[in-house]
Amino acid sequence: MAFQKENFIKFILMVFALSSLFFLFLIFAFILIEGLPLFLKVGLKNIIFGFKWAPTKGSFGIFPMIVSSFLVTFGALVVGGPMGLSCAVYLSEYSGKKMKMLLKPALELLAGIPSVVYGFLGVIYIVPLVRNYLGGSGFSLIATSIILGVMILPTIISISFDALMSVPKSFREGSLAMGATKWQTIYKVVIPSAKSGIMAGFILGMGRAIGETMAVIMIAGNALKIPTSILDPLRTLTGNIALELAYATGDHRLGLFSTGVVLLVIIMILNYMANFGIKKKRLK
Amino acid sequence: MNQMTEKLYILFLFIGIFTVSCGRETSDRKDNQSPITIAGSTSVMPFTEKLAEYFMLDNPDYVIDVQGGGSTAGVQACINRTVDIGMSSRRLKDDEKSLRDITICNDGIAIVVHPGNPLNNLTIDQIRGIFNGRIKNWKELGWIDRKIDAVSREEGSGTRGSFEDLIMNKMEIDDGIMVQDSNGSVKEVVATDPYAMGYISLGLVDERVRGLSVDGVAPTTENIKDGSYKIERPFLFLINGTPDENTQSFIDFVLSKEGQIILKKEGLIDIL
């Protein structure tokens, strides 16, 4: 009796576990079915390396958006990377229990704030700041990078923190016993040993930044051109889909799905890289 | 003990599922009226909502469901018969002519700037130049040496479509122009950025943004009505085939004097 129930529960749990895989498969299939026909019709090169996006007039080039997506992602890393890593190092190496108890929930809260709130704050505060002190319209690469940098902090911190914590204590003790100071130990021993995990955190942060939509639409300005300065507006892949989907029909709609395919491939590569990093760490 | 709690959980789960599914069935059926569904242009939507509110006040047993989605989506939904009425803020294209369009009112498109902007008038050619990327600096229009932060709408938008038809004259809107995805967002950008310029529905112009005269004609309801302000477009209701009784009575209400007065109060141009 008990055994049967055990099995029954196991089966139910397995069904739910597999359903997540099933949804992933559905999403893949759906995006590919909708997105691929246009690649066949217009040509891969004309979409990925095309400079002109005028879907109602038959141009589907999304190269500027690919570049813009990577630019904001890189910008977010420049803003959020050092901050996140410092926070993780502080948390794992220096902070006492009390500080940890304060910082950890705060970070979880930061992760839970909806992106539209970030976007709203960006429009109200960051954009005017950029406009008044740096110039341009304020809807810009730099404003977007700052907001995204803050948004990816929780991801970077929590994964880097785990990586730093998993460095064995004996490494630190060995280094200290050799006469190294605490900072030398962190800099020369702990961070290098946790390198692949920290990289994984950065890459997952990149994935979050490249996939962010709502906040980006609100502060990026969404101009189609490749930005030539950090004060220029830009449009990301996700922004393009969300901006135009409501009105799109026919080929225009397919074009947006093609944008989705490209985005999916980029995210897949990033996740693969992150997993690779984590695995390498475990093998060590 | 453990088994008891487990059983309780399962019981609660079933009760939960049961009540939810029951709730669905009963709550949607207030009466025998099926709701009138309307979808389409986000420019027309707020006004349709207002009209629906007034209509339901007088006829409490009608249910009107108004959704956005954009002009093109409205046309599509109407062709597929997923809605009773489609809304569009642009004229129908040739392949969409199977639908019947009813002009419920006209709307001007105002070229708006920040209230602190000293300019009052632009020519159509200047506006075209700005959005075409030929004129980039306010200095060229006789103001300070500062880049113009022009804001357009996204591809497929009815307002953008009308703007292209009425102003751009087959010229393309430049890639460097910013894009926002609703009248509201464009207005927000223009209201907060002193160097911005955009175009929005005239009905939405208030003290936070200022509408510019075009070729010397101010964007007012009177000037649109007598035809001197040229940048105007119709707000359309679209129907596929013969509408049912409920739908027809709502359309009649919108076209009646009462409905038109409501639209006029909202800053639109009535068709009386």
Residue ranges and their predicted role:
Chain B
Residues 2-10:
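Bacterial N-terminal signal peptides that target proteins for export
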Residues 9-19:
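Bacterial N-terminal signal peptides
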Residues 22-72, 76-82, 86-272:
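Exported/periplasmic ABC-transporter solute-binding proteins
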